[in-house]
Amino acid sequence: MTSTDRSLLASVSSKFTEETLRNVLIKLTGDDGAVVTSWNVEAAAGKGDNYLSVVSRVTIDGLVQGKSSRNTVIVKAIPTNKTRNTIFRSKDFFKNETAFYTKVIALFEEFLTKKGKLELLNVPRCLGYLEDGENDFIVLEDAKAKGFSGIDRLKAWKYEDCKVIFKAFAQYHGISLAVLQQQPQELLEATKYLSEPLFTEKFWDWYGRYYTLSINAAQDAMAKEYPGTPQEEKFRTMTSRKLFSKCVELLNERNKSVFVVNHGDSWATNFMTRILPNGDHDAIIFDFQLARCASPVHDLAYFVYTVTDKETRDKYFLNLLKYYHNEMKQIMAELGSNIDDIYPLSLFMEEVKEQFVFGFAFGLETLPMSMLSADESFDLDDTNGEVLNIADIWTLKPTNNKVNRLRLADVVKHGIDHGFL
């Protein structure tokens, strides 16, 4: 039920107002005379599904072209808990995502519109934003209104499920590569507003304690599931600092001439899927707070290690990689580019060998969190006072759940067996 209770809007952000809703409704419908009559705000993400922002679904009732209209949008807002904001550096991540939508996606939209291919952009449309470091929010179209539904982050995905996401990444990365090939200076200009929010040496003191807990959990899993094996012995000598520094190195030494604007955080909760009338499956990608310029392999690796199970990796790993590259080739051809001129299969497979470790290293942080049930997830709004480090909130410990522990150990074993570590 909608109302005219302005406190509902203020619960999103003190700067999220009725005027904001009107501007959003105008952009959404194209009617400059649209009128907002009432609204409602409800939570749009479950506990444990989103840590860096508060996600709400806002219903807007109004008059469009003189007729009653109801629309829903998604609003990502910086948490109102000031301690939480400080601990998690929320403003840095919001600044990065705002730049992604206002600079990078704006360029992609312009590029695709000129080619009559805007429908290829599988990213929610940005309908409004505010960025001041304290009251930030981003308003996005509601993918549910287009038939998309969320994904269970606790389940391990099978081959056919993974193909849907690999195709979605081929589409998104293919657009990025086509823009790079055809409008390189414009892309470089747009991406200069992105700022690495995690894997840079200055953030080790902020991130290192928690990342060490994650690697400790993975080492414990290996010791219990694969004790005394060469893989367990190799991983036992690996430190969190070495893995973190390797990620920093890969970002600093990437091939500056060939890159995509990575999603950066490709675990299950950042996708929604739907079934099209012809029976095909489709996916949309969202939550770009970790967007960065890097090899597309990073997104694929992170997805593989946080979402798939051992059986899927063992049977279909190479198939998925080839499927992705072939799908990207088709998208780029549709946009007037030849993938073989910029990112042939040989270069892609070379980057798999060299760069897959990035998704492996980052995935070891995310996988333990992704396997927590809602009851086990951390309540970030309980943070008050002098808590200064994320490790004081994300008090991750080795799991006693054998299924989850084996899943974590199998990720480590796969990375080592394939020479990524």
Predicted regions and their residues:
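Juxta-kinase regulatory segment immediately upstream of eukaryotic protein kinase catalytic domains
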Residues: T2-V41
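Plant-skewed but cross-kingdom recognition/interaction modules and surfaces
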Residues: R236-S240, D282, L321, L335-S346
